């Protein structure tokens, strides 16, 4: 079963050093080791890179963005018109923000019904099972 990995899992792993960030790093290690079949949107790079730059600066964001794009055993899913249409439907029928609708729509269309995220809003998306880290 494929698991969609939300941007916040990558962000916590890079930005912080606490119990939650350690759990995020362990989840990412499980992907690298092949114990977790994982996908995320290509758009996750945008969110990840933007937040890392805002907190740690442009140079670190460029380095971490390059590492992110080479992440082993992580499948990057495209943003298609089908994703946008599904995201728009989610936007109309849930309280999710636009970017979160894109993530949820990408997961649903890819059949990745387990959604690894620290964001509790995803627990209310029909068809997804939010899995906290």
What is each PLM-predicted segment?
Residues 5-6, 40-41, 96-97, 119, ...:
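Histidine- and aromatic-rich ligand-binding microenvironments
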Residues 2, 104-133:
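Acidic, PIN/NYN-like endoribonuclease modules and their adjacent C-terminal/linker elements
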Residues 47-49, 53-75:
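Active-site-proximal, substrate-binding regions of enzyme catalytic domains
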Residues 33-35, 71-72, 125:
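Structured helix-beta-strand junction loops
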Residues 9, 44, 83, 103, ...:
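Alpha-helix capping/helix-boundary segments
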Residues 1-40, 53-63:
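Short, well-structured N-terminal submotif of metal-dependent ribonuclease cores
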Residues 9-10, 47-51, 86:
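A general alpha-helix detector
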Residues 25, 74-116:
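Active-site neighborhoods of divalent-metal-dependent phosphate/nucleic-acid chemistry enzymes
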């Amino acid at each position: 079963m494929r698991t969609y990995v939300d941007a916040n899992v990558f962000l916590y792993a890079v930005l912080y050093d606490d119990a939650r960030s350690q759990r995020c790093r362990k989840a990412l290690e499980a992907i690298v080791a092949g114990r977790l079949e994982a996908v995320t949107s290509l758009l996750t790079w945008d969110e990840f890179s933007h937040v890392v730059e805002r907190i740690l600066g442009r140079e670190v964001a460029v380095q971490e963005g390059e590492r992110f794009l080479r992440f082993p055993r992580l499948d990057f899913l495209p943003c298609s018109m089908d994703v946008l249409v599904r995201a728009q439907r989610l936007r109309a029928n849930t309280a999710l923000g636009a970017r979160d609708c894109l993530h949820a729509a990408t997961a649903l269309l890819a059949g990745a019904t387990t959604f690894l995220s620290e964001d509790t809003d995803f627990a209310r998306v029909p068809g997804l099972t939010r899995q906290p880290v």
